[in-house]
């Protein structure tokens, strides 16, 4: 019931956001928006969630709250062995050693997580960037120089390799975030953007780029997918010919994940201890 009230308040603030120039209106809105940010930060709510039938739903009101966070906060000096000037704090501001032990998060020097992003237990964060509203599920590693965009959803026991870009989406506000389901391996320097869903157990090879309009071709069946990689697919970069014989980039499903693939891409539990 309380969450429904918060949702209703956020939607009302969003409709009347032009009034936020009024200080008292802005002050009242800030109290509500900070409640949403706190719920996001703790993982009690998330921008997108998977239903029992495998479909994902996007909670637009939460995305609206994140956008309103930028409207209701003032930029301030932020000291982290160097100065920044931003509206959003680091998630780990004020944390002590005990809090890190309790959360079972390993945050390597150079990682930066903005407040409102959720990070689950046994997650390893190498020097990387996690943007607002993102959700990183338990047992996942975000490797060096990877960027997780706003509201992106990363599943359990995933490995997001070095230099990977996972697209964010706060504009346009109704667009769906990128979703990486459980037990996926995203190869180095790959890019997934524009609301694409990588289904459970899939493996993307190094340098695979997938957006909403990217052709994803199953080599065995010649079936073409857009915006979604089927479960347990092994995907590599490739090319296909257009109607006028011009070579166009595509992603190719070369096979389904087998035991050999699992051995090559399995996560190392020692690194998460």
Swiss-Prot record:
Gene Ontology biological-process entries: diaminopimelate biosynthetic process; lysine biosynthetic process via diaminopimelate
Keyword Isomerase found: no
CDD domains registered for this protein in UniProt: LbH_THP_succinylT
Cellular component per GO, a single term: cytoplasm
GO molecular function: 2,3,4,5-tetrahydropyridine-2,6-dicarboxylate N-succinyltransferase activity
Keyword Methyltransferase: no
Binding site for substrate: 106, 143
The enzyme's E.C. designation: 2.3.1.117
Pfam families reported in the protein's UniProt record: Hexapep_2, THDPS_N_2
Pathway field: Amino-acid biosynthesis; L-lysine biosynthesis via DAP pathway; LL-2,6-diaminopimelate from (S)-tetrahydrodipicolinate (succinylase route): step 1/3
Compartments (UniProt record): Cytoplasm
Alphabetical UniProt keywords: Acyltransferase, Amino-acid biosynthesis, Cytoplasm, Diaminopimelate biosynthesis, Lysine biosynthesis, Repeat, Transferase
Swiss-Prot/TrEMBL catalytic activity: (S)-2,3,4,5-tetrahydrodipicolinate + succinyl-CoA + H2O = (S)-2-succinylamino-6-oxoheptanedioate + CoA
Family: Belongs to the transferase hexapeptide repeat family.
NCBIfam families recorded: dapD, PRK11830.1
Subunit annotation: Homotrimer.
UniProt-recorded name of the protein: 2,3,4,5-tetrahydropyridine-2,6-dicarboxylate N-succinyltransferase
Source organism of this protein record: Wolbachia sp. subsp. Brugia malayi (strain TRS)
